[in-house]
Amino acid sequence: MKDFSVQHYTFRPLSNEIGMVSMLEKLAAMGYTGAELCCFGGFESLKMTAKELKGYMDDLGLQLVGNHFTREMFQGSHEQAFAYIAEAGGKYAIYNIWGSYNTPADVAEKAEYLNGLAAIAAKAGITLLYHNHAAEFVQMDGKLVIDRLDEVLDPTIGFEHDVFFARQQGCNVYEYLRKHDRRVKTVHLKQLSEDGENVDLPDGVIDMAEVIRSAPYATDYIVEQSSFPVSILNSLEKNADYLKQI
């Protein structure tokens, strides 16, 4: 595998320490070809303009996938935030909604919110993606919440499928990816151990090569990790080496 990205959430503690530019240099040296930002509420924490970010990433041969937002933490103008992504060379505004989905009406209300954002994203020239956690793989009146969302979300909205949370809830992630094939635009490669922990990519129960084969229409495959057996850098290097071999 030649092209793979990494989620900012994975390395944010380290980038906060050494600076984003130095972090991007390390990622490029390891073989990553892209990054997905995780500025939940906006881009002030980056301390650089969109043009500056694009320049740094271009110089390093890195592609900006987009940025991950949360409904609960975002403040300010979606128009400005989405314009930043577009100017920095990104393709996607990725959203998740924390918490549970309690009723079909709750699903419909949240879908309406996301559909409104999709229209704003389209005006900026980017695409809205929906990122799952565990709550979307719970049954609601005989149907998974994610399938209910699939029915009511605007067809322009893509899915960013996080295989860790889906598998944690008992979902066959390969079948899911094939079922929603063209809607799955990006995949979070986050590994699950037999005892339910987040581990390095080579060391868990999810067959990442099969994940990639099951999502042929995805534009980006993105490493995400929140627990590190040795260190962030060690896991980043180990994961990159693993992906180069599959």
Locate predicted features:
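N-terminal pre-domain/capping segments
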Residues: M1-A88
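Histidine-acidic metal/acid-base catalytic patches
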Residues: M1-M30, Y84-G89, M140-H161, A166-I246
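Active-site-proximal loop/turn and secondary-structure-junction residues that shape catalytic pockets
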Residues: T10-R12, C39-G41, T70-M73, I97-Y101, ...
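A structural signal for alpha-helical segments
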Residues: S22, S45-M48, A105, E109, ...
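Active-site acidic/histidine proton-transfer and metal-coordination neighborhood
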Residues: E25, D59, Q63, E72-G158, ...
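Conserved beta-strand positions in the central sheet of alpha/beta enzyme cores
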Residues: E36, G66, I94, L129, ...
